[in-house]
Structures are given as structure tokens and as C-alpha cells.
């Protein structure tokens, strides 16, 4: 189906769910991923496996703050990764991730959003951030 990665660090505004810019397509056999909106459009009804990970806070963040990523379907959050706290250590690079199976309908729109309660950055190179989807079953 598809896999896309990020290629650079982007600003992550404080306390805002921000669509992750997975801007480099590794493959897209179903032509379902849009690199302008960073959204996948489901090509047919079925169960899809989604994997997502994103580097957050290139230089770490303070212990009083948290970060996570979420899957949004048609503009609504449907899954959230574990939340992690900062460590006050600039060597700490959080990489929240999600791996789920979802029942989706044709034309559902899926994107990944990053969140940090402190203003930081997200993304990084392809070794840190990736979003992929594949059809695993037709219902």
C-alpha cells in the first residue's frame, strides 16, 4: 500500500495537534498518500494495518511536559500513543509510535498528528519518522 517518511525537522507548536509532514514517499502501490496534505485516502473498505512513529523534540524537553502522536480519521482522533514525559536531558529523543489494525471505509482520510505540551520540533530524517498503511483483510 504505502510508506512515507519525514526528511527534516519541523516546528511543533505548543499544545496543538499538528499533522506530521511525512514528505518523502518510499512506495505507494495504491496511490493513496497525498504529499501535499500528508493524508492517506483509503481506496477500498477493509481492515488496514497502520504503523506510525515520529521523532519529537530534537534536543529533548523538560520533565513537566508530555508528548505523543495520534491517528486521526476524517478529522477526529481515534487512537493515541503512550504519552511520555520529558527528562530534562537534551540527549533524550522521544519517538512515540502506534501500530494498530483499523476497520476503514473507502474514502476515509487518515493522518498522523504530533503533540507536545511544550513548543518543540518533530520529524527528523527517515530513521526517526515513518507512516505506513496496508490492507490486511476485506470485510
What spans do the regions from the language model cover?
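Extracellular jelly-roll beta-sandwich "head" domains, especially the C-terminal globular C1q domain
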Residues: 1-139
